[in-house]
Amino acid sequence: MNADTIHYLNLFLGTGTILLQVFCVVTLFILFFNFKKNKKNVFLDFIDKHFLILVFLISLSATIFPLVYSEIIRFVPCYLCWWQRVFMFPLVLIFGVALWDKDRKVIRYVLPLLCAGFLASVYQNFFYYFGENSNLPCDASGVSCYQHVVSVFGGYISIPMMALTVFFSLLTLLAVAHFYKKEI
């Protein structure tokens, strides 16, 4: 891939990451205030109805794009990125089977994977943005967990931030599917 294609891919994914972050904040805000009033909400109804499709598509995207970066563009993932892949990649299959079977109880199966991936991502983001001098574990290949391979929108969007956003968005959708009550 040439540099322009990589640049536009980074911009596309960076914009998608910011939109997903806005979506999560708005969704949690509506869920919290709807939870207090227990009112029917069209936005939350849509999310609740299409929950399995949404989580499947987000997890599929979160699997495809890291593979594009590592296998096509040839960015070598760091140690913590590998751990996040361990927790993200199986979710595509689990959410795919849940979508096929229309199994909304998938929450209990994926919650441990999502929480572990989210914690690994929070850990990586903390040291990526705030702890340049820490002893963050990096693999023997010399790939640094601090390497700024993708840095879009003034350095705010990076690969670790993309991963954190994906885990957070999946947890947000799980929260809506679990806590949103449709009764008026």
Language-model region placement:
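Secretory/periplasmic and organellar redox-cofactor proteins
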Residues: 1-77, 88-91, 95, 99-184
